[in-house]
């Protein structure tokens, strides 16, 4: 047992619940704003088009179609909303 271990033992409270509470309080504002933006009508419609495309492509065994365009449309709509709201939530 070294000096560092002894100092660590003296400074830690040893209460794992306290450490968990501190970790739970941290919430990424980007995640929160993205979730809010995904509820907007424009994003909901883009997600529906993406999900329909995914179902269509998944149901076929041999297809060259992919859902890249639909994915980019959804991400663009969501990120456009996020860009206007994110910095209002930062300190």
Swiss-Prot record:
It is a peripheral membrane protein. It is found in: Mitochondrion inner membrane. Gene3D superfamilies: Ubiquinol-cytochrome C reductase hinge domain. The modification N6-acetyllysine is found at residues 42, 85. Residues 14-27 have a biased composition (Acidic residues). Residues 1-13 form a transit peptide. GO terms for molecular function: ubiquinol-cytochrome-c reductase activity. GO terms for cellular component: mitochondrial inner membrane; mitochondrion; respiratory chain complex; respiratory chain complex III. Disulfide bonds join 37-81, 53-67. Residues 1-30 are annotated as: Disordered. Belongs to the UQCRH/QCR6 family. It is linked to Mitochondrial complex III deficiency, nuclear type 11: A form of mitochondrial complex III deficiency, a disorder of the mitochondrial respiratory chain resulting in a highly variable phenotype depending on which tissues are affected. MC3DN11 is an autosomal recessive form characterized by recurrent episodes of severe lactic acidosis, hyperammonemia, hypoglycemia, and encephalopathy. Component of the ubiquinol-cytochrome c oxidoreductase, a multisubunit transmembrane complex that is part of the mitochondrial electron transport chain which drives oxidative phosphorylation. Component of the ubiquinol-cytochrome c oxidoreductase (cytochrome b-c1 complex, complex III, CIII), a multisubunit enzyme composed of 11 subunits. The complex is composed of 3 respiratory subunits cytochrome b, cytochrome c1 and Rieske protein UQCRFS1, 2 core protein subunits UQCRC1/QCR1 and UQCRC2/QCR2, and 6 low-molecular weight protein subunits UQCRH/QCR6, UQCRB/QCR7, UQCRQ/QCR8, UQCR10/QCR9, UQCR11/QCR10 and subunit 9, the cleavage product of Rieske protein UQCRFS1. This is Cytochrome b-c1 complex subunit 6, mitochondrial.
């Amino acid at each position: 047992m070294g000096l560092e271990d002894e100092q660590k033992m003296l400074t830690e409270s040893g209460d794992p619940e306290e450490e968990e509470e501190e970790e739970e309080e941290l919430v990424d504002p980007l995640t929160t704003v993205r979730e809010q933006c995904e509820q907007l009508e424009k994003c909901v419609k883009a997600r529906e088009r993406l999900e329909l495309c995914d179902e269509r492509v998944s149901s076929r065994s041999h297809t060259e179609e992919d859902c890249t365009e639909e994915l980019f449309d959804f991400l663009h709509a969501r990120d456009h909303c996020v860009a206007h709201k994110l910095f209002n939530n930062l300190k």
